[in-house]
Structure formats: structure tokens, C-alpha cells
Amino acid sequence: MRARMALKYAGVEVEHREIELRNKPQSMLLVSPKGTVPVLCLGDGLVLDQSLEIMYWALGQCDPDGWTLVDEVNAHDWVETNDGPFKTLLDQYKYPNRYPDLQQQEVLAKAIDLMLYPIEVSLQKS
């Protein structure tokens, strides 16, 4: 989702293909053997198969609002928190049957403490 959003924001035209993950096309596996999405095949033979890579590449093509002109360390920390511990908590909240020993309200509270409160503090400072 975030790779697609960055491409759209940057005005980069791409051929979008929906992939059924249970039935990955051979053409996709040839360019990206690990078989995960997203995959962006560039004309020069370069293949990007991480959403964050695709985001940075797209913003490198066109960044009309200067999103990349930020404190890189702070931005990286937010992405790492989102992709690591927050994603874990999100999965625990979304799929409670996979985590029967966890209480959803406790997971939600941890997620709020991890992401929402720090975002509010950051926004209040700006």
C-alpha cells in the first residue's frame, strides 16, 4: 500500500498487476525469486522488492512537497517502529485467534502507547 501511495504521489506511471499470492506468476518469480510483493521492475533491469525501497525511489523521482527534506534519523526511527513492534501489535490485535493468550485491550493499549501518544507529542511540538 505505501509503495503504491508513494508512486502515485510522485506521479510515477507504472503497470499495476494484482498478484494472487497463492498462485504467483512465473514472470514475477523470475524477477523476484523471493516471491513477495510489492515488486517494481525498472527499465534498466533494476528490481526493487521492498516497499520502503520503492517509496524512496519514487520520492527520488519527484517529491513535490519535500517529504524527504526531514530529519532522516527521526524518519527512519518512525519507520522502524511502524514496521517492527507496531506491526507485531497490529497483527496480534487483528488476528486474536492466532494469539489466544493475549488480551485484545492490552494489545491495543500497547499499540497506542507505542505509536499514537508519541505522534501526538511530536505534532504538538511542530
Stretches found by the model and what they are:
Residues 1-117, 123-125:
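GST-like domain detector, emphasizing the conserved glutathione-binding G-site
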